[in-house]
UniProtKB/Swiss-Prot annotation:
Residues 211-459 are annotated as: Kinase. Residues 601-669 are annotated as: Required for membrane-binding. This is O-antigen chain terminator bifunctional methyltransferase/kinase WbdD. Changing residue 350 to A: 10% decrease in kinase activity. Changing residue 351 to A/E: Loss of kinase activity. The gene is wbdD. It comes from Escherichia coli. Signal peptide: none annotated. One of its GO terms (biological process) is methylation. S-adenosyl-L-methionine binds at residues 16-17, 36, 61, 82-87, 108-111, 128. Residues 687-708 are annotated as: Required for localizing WbdA to the membrane.
Amino acid sequence: MTKDLNTLVSELPEIYQTIFGHPEWDGDAARDCNQRLDLITEQYDNLSRALGRPLNVLDLGCAQGFFSLSLASKGATIVGIDFQQENINVCRALAEENPDFAAEFRVGRIEEVIAALEEGEFDLAIGLSVFHHIVHLHGIDEVKRLLSRLADVTQAVILELAVKEEPFYWGVSQPDDPRELIEQCAFYRLIGEFDTHLSPVPRPMYLVSNHRVLINDFNQPFQHWQNQPYAGAGLAHKRSRRYFFGEDYVCKFFYYDMPHGILTAEESQRNKYELHNEIKFLTQPPAGFDAPAVLAHGENAQSGWLVMEKLPGRLLSDMLAAGEEIDREKILGSLLRSLAALEKQGFWHDDVRPWNVMVDARQHARLIDFGSIVTTPQDCSWPTNLVQSFFVFVNELFAENKSWNGFWRSAPVHPFNLPQPWSNWLYAVWQEPVERWNFVLLLALFEKKAKLPSAEQQRGATEQWIIAQETVLLELQSRVRNESAGSEALRGQIHTLEQQMAQLQSAQDAFVEKAQQQVEVSHELTWLGENMEQLAALLQTAQAHAQADVQPELPPETAELLQRLEAANREIHHLSNENQQLRQEIEKIHRSRSWRMTKGYRYLGLQIHLLRQYGFVQRCKHFIKRVLRFVFSFMRKHPQVKHTAVNGLHKLGLYQPAYRLYRRMNPLPHSQYQADAQILSQTELQVMHPELLPPEVYEIYLKLTKNK
């Protein structure tokens, strides 16, 4: 290093971070990094302990290398990336001061570095307060893609994200919620919020991974994950719950609020209540109830989580959907024994459904979704009576070929469609007074169902009416639900198109307004050009007064002209600023998803319009010209191909016609000054460039404007 550290630090655009190992600069650092370092070190230690070795770390936007070198001091192998050479110079000087550190620093762009990463090259990536600049340059979708790839090729990513509310030029480009940048990743968790030196708005820090569940007291890889509790759940819980499945664990991760505010207060409270309820039940299960062990649990302001022992087997709903053979006797028997045992201790499961039952290889059934275990005997949906709801569950076990899709349940309540002895069993319960209905009674009658009288022989007119009515109601529910789903999808598409049209109309209105303003300025400039000779004469008069050593008093016409000239200059400056802002708005529109989605539609409409305007022959000529331009451009970039083509044309005697065609399409350029001189009149040039005025007039002009 040819320069000492003092010189390198003095050359920094900003001392943004604490200078590692040099407390003399602590007071000059824009941000105190120690609080964030504690949190980053904690996550580093957790992952290092889980992997059983020091980590390979990539620090994107490393600035002065404080975090990189701090982790290197713990044994990490570090690569730091920053686009400013001055930052990298300081990092390298600090690395030279610590030769035992495995730290390398490079100048580079984050987009290019992420694109070139190989899977497993780094264990941990850090990106602190840097990706908002990339959002501003390339848009939200591109940053989402970059972060997805970063999470794919590493075990964990730590991100500090700027927010839209910060009062800076890049704020308008940011998403409404920073989680929009990472919600496509499998696992993300808020681990802290930190103030900055720029504004009082705190920035959140997230831990992200596509491979691991990353909780302070639990750090393990998962085999797969899903944001539905079971197959076919649709938009249950609005995708606010994520489920991670490891080799021997299951992790439930519930979000209490979501980007775009899609969760209502009731839905958020439901997530929180069910998770708390499940944690409470599993940490203190009733005596004799076979509950999975709790491995970890916790929460923060945005989310809560529970990691538990993985039960063997498969979901009953998956087995039914796959048409697998099941032993209904064993499944119902084991399930009833669990429900009766819970009931005796004052607990009930309010959501006994095929997707909340796990069946092992011995066809033994176990309840899951322990957040649905309550102390009030009432189902979470229709029918609210728990025994009636269990009737529906039993019907679902035997209704493999039904296509009903009801609002609440897709099987009937009555037991009369069941085969014997199952219908005899439930009909015996049906005949009991409702106040005696419970799972103990269901279990007692289940165990002697083979000896119960036939339900068919006892069926009367009331039972027949119930069968007919329930069948019709389920069919009608299915049709209404299917039509409602189709209508909802169409409404969503219409709403999206209306939003896109509104955006395009707004942009068009802005263009028209700016164009009108520019036309008004153009008229003003034209008037000034037409009266330039009069202005020159008045300036000569003013010069004569100045030579007489008399302070000239400008005639009213001159004062008015100068005022209008000054106003025109201000207007031009104002319009230039607005034009720049308009260009930025246009860029945002061009980067938007709606613009890309309507690209094909716009191109097709343009081609139809041009075909109508110019006709088929002219459009064909235009197409041929475009092809020829492409060919000429290709040959200019590839001299060897051009040389071969020219030789071939000479041999065929076609060189001169081809050259004339080339010159016709690519005329020799004229100088910019000549082109401007052909377009602008002398008077217009003098308005735009006062130095072109006659020397005497220009001298007066300078005297009149020197105090402005």
